[in-house]
């Protein structure tokens, strides 16, 4: 259960949800000198089927266009200090309150220097404000709720649940599987996750999900 509600061009849309994901991401070597840091990205993703938006039943209308709705928070970084005792259930204590670039980021104690996410409609629309909360549902699953607005005045209210997954990457031989695991274990106990390494050329991927029943 969940919802994906937008107010787009002053029209209220209640859209179906596809491919919900809650992922902790980190990488080294994605650019020269890029190393693993003391924070991890909390990437909340959801999609909705592409459709032709034609509220006035007139394909020549200025508002008629193809929409490809989605959500992505790939710039939302959570510092190490917010992970308590290596328990992934501590994520439910994290609350994001983004009120625009230059406002205070309570997660880091510094100012936001970029939007933590975006909504996709006809194009990408970065958040101008957003409130995000999480709740642990058990068996490695979380529910998330996001609400706010974008740079093009699209309002959003989104809720969904999904298993907690992990995606770690060592690009260009910059990290071994043991090094990625050791780094991740500083945040959350690696024993609480089923993680599988995959080598693709010089790049090492470590993917998995939280174990059910923990």
What are these regions (language model features)?
Residues 10-13, 90, 100, 124, ...:
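Intrinsically disordered, low-complexity regions enriched in small/polar residues
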Residues 1-119, 204-213:
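An ectodomain-focused feature that recognizes extracytoplasmic/extracellular
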Residues 176-214:
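Intrinsically disordered, low-complexity terminal/linker regions enriched in Pro/Ser/Gly
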Residues 5, 25, 52-54, 143, ...:
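Compositionally biased, low-structure terminal segments
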Residues 37-39, 141-147, 173-183:
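Short, well-ordered strand-loop elements centered on a beta-strand within folded domains, enriched
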